[in-house]
A protein has these predicted regions:
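Acidic, aromatic-enriched beta-alpha/helix-loop junctions
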Residues: 28-65
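Short, compact, well-ordered microdomains
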Residues: 2-4, 63-93
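Short, surface-exposed secondary-structure edge patches
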Residues: 16-20
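Cysteine-centered metal-binding/redox modules
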Residues: 15, 58-60, 69-70
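Short, structured beta-strand/loop micro-motifs enriched in basic residues and often containing a Trp
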Residues: 4-13
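A structural detector for beta-sheet-dominated domains
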Residues: 12-14, 30, 87-89
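Disulfide-bonded cysteine motifs in exported proteins
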Residues: 13, 38, 70-73
Length: 93
């Protein structure tokens, strides 16, 4: 039996009215670890709001299995709304 391997996850900014992000910014996670070199700013308010979905995506749970067409979530800090999409990816070696 092979060992389970988590998915790497990136958060892509879909839209933003916040000065911390612009559309297209990305945040990269390798397991529970943030890739600081590749990532844009990290807002803990936003991340905390939808972290359970990030965790599920890391464990290879798909958007469809979670009941969504895509994993797009909004930061709850009003009025500076930011929409993030969670994307599972694998490094090409």
């Amino acid at each position: 039996m092979s060992e389970f391997k988590e998915c790497k996850v990136k958060l892509v900014v879909k839209s933003s009215k916040c000065e911390l992000y612009k559309s297209g910014d990305e945040i990269y996670l390798d397991g529970a670890v943030l890739n600081k070199e590749k990532s844009a700013n990290v807002c803990l308010t936003a991340i905390n709001a939808f972290y359970p979905f990030i965790y599920a995506a890391r464990k290879r749970v798909t958007a469809e299995q979670m009941g969504f067409d895509e994993l797009t979530f909004q930061c709850p800090d009003c009025p500076e709304t930011v929409e993030f999409t969670i994307v599972q990816y694998e490094d090409i070696e």
